[in-house]
Every structure is written in structure tokens, then in C-alpha cells.
């Protein structure tokens, strides 16, 4: 038997990126031999083992043959005669089909090193089209390595388009679609993930609510980029520069879904789009099993982003109600997350990429002042039951209003 380090660990070492997981392939062995050596078998569909000491994954070299639909419709052959090259042949991209032996010698039958140097994501073989999950994986790699200059080979993008048009994507489970999306949201350039899906015609299948935004115009005065789909990807890009919080990034992606519902005769204006988008977001999140934490922030951002943009025009009472509705007294981080999305929304427009967002500082100070209003003095003054909350809201609004007057006066002086 011979053991090789394969896949991401080899690729990331060559890219001088941090290696997170190490996966090994074992050539010329069997299930019986691995168990006899103390390895623990964990793979049900194909023989994968955990090392008795390191707990790292070791898989027997195998070939795969498509037997059904989706990414699970495969039969595997892991007999002793399967070669290293045969195992590498079943992998998705050439950059993931490089192996390294115990002496550091590389085996690269499909020229993955050349593609790493050329910064190209290229499929290993035409068997690429047998696994629809690869559309999402390649889009995710494009997002992950975009900052390094990687692009997808045109012929690979064509195969991804073929998969999207074949109906195979319909066989992906919602959980797996979300898993890949969630990983993409943690990448350095998550907007590239959705851009690639749009290019290969997979976005309309997997995320039709986002795809519907493309071709919907906005007022050029406020949106020089005009197209709502383009704006959405710009917002995701800018928000990702401001925060690595995946829930914040997801909320940025879906904040304008309501604009797709605007009747054409009302274009390019989109009255009430934030509220119109709420049922669309709920439906999307239910379909692909988005975590509640992500969903709740997304709903808040869609519902309130116009109010946040208009913060300086809001009455103090309205600001207190906004803080109540967002449950910010118990979850102050939610206000920060909402403001990050809104800042990204402002910057996600052609020519506004460096813009500051004074609304955030203003509302955070309003919140700080309102949080410090003393409820004990209200109780001591004799208020009881529901009167306490009503008076607390009045006192908070008064405190915010006093600050608002000072803020406006200070700006007028400058």
C-alpha cells in the first residue's frame, strides 16, 4: 500500500494558503487491511477511514460510475488495483487533482500545477457533468480564489451551463445547496459565487428570487448602475469588505428582493419594496433551509433599510419604535449588523464605493443615549404596569430628540 496527500491540502500549499484539512488516498490496500491496521471506517457509500492517532481522513483509491440522478447517484469501485491516476481522474478540477507522496514528490497527471500558475479553474474530464454539485463547488472556488486572480476556463463554464440546462440541479437537496452557499458567503468575494451561477444559467434554478432582479431598473439619479441585479452583487461585495459576518452578507444579498415584484409601469421606482420582499425572503429561507439567525436579520434589513437611510428625517418616537421592533435593547449587535448592511447598500452603487455613512454613527449614539435612560426613576415616580413602558418610551424619545436638535445645529454651524 502507498499513501498520498491529495486535494485541497496540496493545492493550498502550492498557493501558499493556509492548509485547514488534510485528506489522504491509499493505493493498493483493502478495507480488511485498513481495519487490521487500526483505522476506523466512517464512510458508508465508499471506504473512508480515520487514522487511529491523528483522526485525519484516509480513503481507498476508487473509481466512480454514474448510476442515477444528482450527486449521490454513483457506484464506487475501491479494489486494490485502482491506480492513483484513476482516483485523481474522478476529481472535479485539475487544481484539486494533484497528489503528494511521503517524500514530497508530486503526481500531477492532469496539469493542475500549470493551471495553478495560470490561475485557471479547469475540469479534469468530461465526467465533470455527471455531478451537478460541481456547479456550486466551482462557483465557490471562483469566489474563494477571486482575489488571487483565478478565473473559470470557458470550456468548464460551458459544461456548468450544460448541467444547469439538463435538469440535474433539481436533484440537489436543499441542505446541500445551502451548505455550498454558506461556504461561499465566508469567502473573500462571495458576490463572485452568485455572478458565476448567473453566467452559467444556474442562478435561475437555484436562487430564482435573486435572478429575478436582473433586468429590473432603478432610478439612475440614485443608482448609476441602474440594474437591480448588478446593484445587489455590488452591495454584497461592499458589505463583505465591511464585515465577514455571514448573516450580514446574506441579508445584503436579499435586501432588495421586493424590487422584482414592482409592476413594470411603476419602474424605475420601487415603492414599499422592503415590505414586499418579506414574504419572498421567508419563502427562499424555508426552501433552502437557511438558519433562523440569517433569516431574521434578512427580514429586518429588508423591512428597515429605507428607514435607516432616512435616519436624519425620522422623528425621535419613530427611532424608539425602530429600536423596539428590532429587539435591540436585548440584542444590540443586531443594530450594528443592520447598519453594516445599510452602509454596504449605500456603497453598492457605481461611484459610491468609498462613501461614509453618518447615519450609522448617528443611530448608534441615539441608541446609546436611549439605553442609558433610567427605568428605576420612572418606577420611583409612581408609574405602574404598562405605564412604566409608556413613560420609558417617552423619556427615550425625549433624550433622542434633544440629541437630534444638537446634532442638526452642529452640522449647520459647519
From Swiss-Prot:
Residues 228-329 form the HD domain. ATP binds at residues 8, 11, 91, 137, 140. Magnesium is required for nucleotidyltransferase activity. A single active site specifically recognizes both ATP and CTP and is responsible for their addition. It comes from Shewanella frigidimarina (strain NCIMB 400). It catalyses: a tRNA precursor + 2 CTP + ATP = a tRNA with a 3' CCA end + 3 diphosphate; a tRNA with a 3' CCA end + 2 CTP + ATP = a tRNA with a 3' CCACCA end + 3 diphosphate. Belongs to the tRNA nucleotidyltransferase/poly(A) polymerase family. Bacterial CCA-adding enzyme type 1 subfamily. Gene3D superfamilies: Beta Polymerase, domain 2, cca-adding enzyme, domain 2. Catalyzes the addition and repair of the essential 3'-terminal CCA sequence in tRNAs without using a nucleic acid template. Adds these three nucleotides in the order of C, C, and A to the tRNA nucleotide-73, using CTP and ATP as substrates and producing inorganic pyrophosphate. tRNA 3'-terminal CCA addition is required both for tRNA processing and repair. Also involved in tRNA surveillance by mediating tandem CCA addition to generate a CCACCA at the 3' terminus of unstable tRNAs. While stable tRNAs receive only 3'-terminal CCA, unstable tRNAs are marked with CCACCA and rapidly degraded. CTP binds at residues 8, 11, 91, 137, 140. Keywords: ATP-binding, Hydrolase, Magnesium, Metal-binding, Multifunctional enzyme, Nickel, Nucleotide-binding, Nucleotidyltransferase, RNA repair, RNA-binding, Transferase, tRNA processing. Monomer. Can also form homodimers and oligomers. It comes from the Bacteria. Its cofactor is Mg(2+); Ni(2+). Its EC number is 2.7.7.72, 3.1.3.-, 3.1.4.-. One of its GO terms (molecular function) is tRNA binding. The lineage of its organism: Bacteria, Pseudomonadati, Pseudomonadota, Gammaproteobacteria, Alteromonadales. Comprises two domains: an N-terminal domain containing the nucleotidyltransferase activity and a C-terminal HD domain associated with both phosphodiesterase and phosphatase activities. Mg(2+) binds at residues 21, 23. One of its GO terms (biological process) is tRNA 3'-terminal CCA addition. The gene is cca. This is Multifunctional CCA protein. It holds the Pfam family PolyA_pol_RNAbd.
